[in-house]
């Protein structure tokens, strides 16, 4: 059981994202969904539950948090971690090894489990969680979704009584989300106490027992799952939540300015670690197009993005712009990539400075206007790395607008974003397309995909297997679920 009694917390470095007068009980064996707009306090609640507050994140804490009878303030983090397993939004933050096998059993190894028992447990997990393709791999060569699977497997291996998830689906494809849902359901059936903070809520509707909606650090409503599912769709939108059912996702991407084949990708191939990641991949893109690059985790999407931007060293094939071949160096000048792990491309000490980086005569008024479009103007003097994950994503998209590049590649730009932030990124993306830029968006986010994309390219085993228009919703959903 998890119990929060009159809990308030503010972070030492910032007044944002804390909680006020939190009273909540998650009963043993119960599965509870925490939802609400970005910055409402969901992640703070998960950190209170697993003891990272106050043992790692410092600030002003009052009230009492108990997990399985342990006061988190008085209990050492090592003891809490035996009882509470956490899967974070960014799995890289919880890795301790460079290979997948060692990472999966790392927690068990630290409990002193004999080597033979470790091997046996690893084999059990491989079958139960469908990990055979991830065994013996270099963690740093995995896709974002594959890393998330390894993080979950490592936590699941230690069999804690309480499982805490912070945006666990943010980097997963639809098929993997379905597998995650099955795992959560299995954990629930086995009696685990589960707390999940999520923006993508559709896959949890048949699993959770209760839905706790947060706003401005407080619990605005706490209802049974059936009551939440009965709410009108208009209420869900007013609450700033994503769809509960994918069938109501909006569709209607922007129209292409001209079918000019400005970008031509011809027979791109890449091998990594002895594996063929891209295999003779070819396609064309026109000015003003917004093309989604979709496919299961590990299909080669991020590798394709790096090739197009001149960031992938090895590989073969040709990339043409207006009929002229582009070297890696020219691609780096022509293209801009918003990375999936966006913290790696933010370099300055303020949001405003980040927007002006590398620009000879930055237009401060233009920077302010663009920041205002995505609700970041109030943070212009903040350090970029002090922003939330969603805010950093939006900042990187803003920088891509200001820098004036013609080929823009976004790798999961809506990962971890709430409805409002997703819509803001969509508006900015549409405006970039209207300027005649070519946009390629690697995404698993079907809501975002259906709203703005003109085409969807499906990659499987390093090859394009389908090229569909954005309006073919039912076919797109079937492909994303692995049903075709």
PLM region descriptions:
Residues 163-166, 408-411:
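Catalytic Walker B motif of ABC-type/P-loop ATPase nucleotide-binding domains
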Residues 58-70, 317-331:
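Conserved ABC transporter NBD signature motif
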Residues 198-199, 443-444:
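H-loop/switch region of ABC-family ATPase nucleotide-binding domains
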Residues 156, 400-401:
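ABC ATPase C-loop
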Residues 116-134, 364-379:
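Conserved ABC ATPase "signature" region
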């Amino acid at each position: 059981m998890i119990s929060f009694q009159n809990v308030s917390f503010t972070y030492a470095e910032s007044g944002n994202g804390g909680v006020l007068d939190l009273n909540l009980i998650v009963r043993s064996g119960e599965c509870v969904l925490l939802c609400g707009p970005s910055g409402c306090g969901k992640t703070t609640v998960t950190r209170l539950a697993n003891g990272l507050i106050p043992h790692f994140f410092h600030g002003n804490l009052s009230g009492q948090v108990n997990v399985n009878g342990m006061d988190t303030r008085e209990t050492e983090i090592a003891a809490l971690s035996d009882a509470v397993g956490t899967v974070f939004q960014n799995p890289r933050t919880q890795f301790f090894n460079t290979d997948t096998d060692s990472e999966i059993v790392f927690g068990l190894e630290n409990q002193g489990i004999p080597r033979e028992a470790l091997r046996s447990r690893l084999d059990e997990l491989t079958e139960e969680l469908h990990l055979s393709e991830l065994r013996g791999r270099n963690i740093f060569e995995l896709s974002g979704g594959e890393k998330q699977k390894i993080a979950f497997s490592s936590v699941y291996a230690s069999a804690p009584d309480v499982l805490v998830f912070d945006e666990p689906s943010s980097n997963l494809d639809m098929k993997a989300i379905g597998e995650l849902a099955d795992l959560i359901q299995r954990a629930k059936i086995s009696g685990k106490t589960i707390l999940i903070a999520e923006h993508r809520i559709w896959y949890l509707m048949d699993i959770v027992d209760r839905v706790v909606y947060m706003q401005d650090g407080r619990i605005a409503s706490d209802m049974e799952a059936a009551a939440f599912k009965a709410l009108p769709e208009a209420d869900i939108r007013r609450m700033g939540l994503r769809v509960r059912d994918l069938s109501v996702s909006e569709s209607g991407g922007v129209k292409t300015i001209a079918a000019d084949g400005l970008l031509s990708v011809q027979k791109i191939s890449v091998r990594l670690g002895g594996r063929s990641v891209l295999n003779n991949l070819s396609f064309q893109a026109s000015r003003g197009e917004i093309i989604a690059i979709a496919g299961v985790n590990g299909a080669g999407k991020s590798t394709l993005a790096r090739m197009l931007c001149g960031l992938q060293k090895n590989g073969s094939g040709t990339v043409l712009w207006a009929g002229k071949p582009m070297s890696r160096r020219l691609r780096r000048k022509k293209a801009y990539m918003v990375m999936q792990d966006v913290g790696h491309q933010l370099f300055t000490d303020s949001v405003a400075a980040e927007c002006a980086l590398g620009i000879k005569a930055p237009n401060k008024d233009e920077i302010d206007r663009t920041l205002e479009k995505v609700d970041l103007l109030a943070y212009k003097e903040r350090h970029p790395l002090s922003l939330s994950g969603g805010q950093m994503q939006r900042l990187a998209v803003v920088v891509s607008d200001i820098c004036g590049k013609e080929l823009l590649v976004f790798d999961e730009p809506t990962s971890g974003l709430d409805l409002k932030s997703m819509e803001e990124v969509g508006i900015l993306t549409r405006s970039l397309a209207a300027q005649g830029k070519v946009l390629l968006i690697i995404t698993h986010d079907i809501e975002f995909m259906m709203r703005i994309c003109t085409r969807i390219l499906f990659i499987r085993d390093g090859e394009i297997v389908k090229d569909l228009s954005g309006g073919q919703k039912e076919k797109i959903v079937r492909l994303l679920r692995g049903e075709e």
